Amino acid sequence: MKVVITGHMNGLGLVLSNKFVQKGYTISGYDLNNDKDVIKEDTINELITDCTDADIFVNNAHANQSSLLTQVFKLWEGMDKTIINISSAITYITPRNLPESLNEYISDKKNLDTTVKLLRMKSELPHIMNIRPSWIETQLVSEFNTKKINPDDIANLIVMLYNMRYAVKILDIVLEK
């Protein structure tokens, strides 16, 4: 089985990649740190081509998520494959006193959640799991003085939910510590 994952070299993406490798999956990763920036057209084309024989697409990197989700969905429409979409609990809860630097992030994640809902209305397949964790223990949010979820716990949950995709339909999971 093959997993295509964005943002696979840090944080949740790194931990999730390692979990899938431990389960015997082949990983094809896209990350700024391996010169596979998912906002560049040549990288996007490579990713879409890579998804033709993949079973799972983990839409983890913040950049270009809605566009990638839509393109992979169109490629896989009607096929028994799975998109694991990493959104944010920040779209569900009402946070207070957040820095303005997060406004674009919040807007992008809300757009992503809307895109998920619209695509699900088109077809039940591919499966789309929308995972919305709150703050995750990563360097990116180390400056925020708030409770954070261990990325290993989230990755374990995601793998478990993927394995249950035929038993229950996973639509939206909001995780908060």
Task: Give names to the regions the model predicted.
Residues 62-83:
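NAD(P)-cofactor binding segment of oxidoreductase domains
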Residues 56-65, 87-90:
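Conserved NAD(P)H cofactor-binding loop of Rossmann-fold oxidoreductase domains
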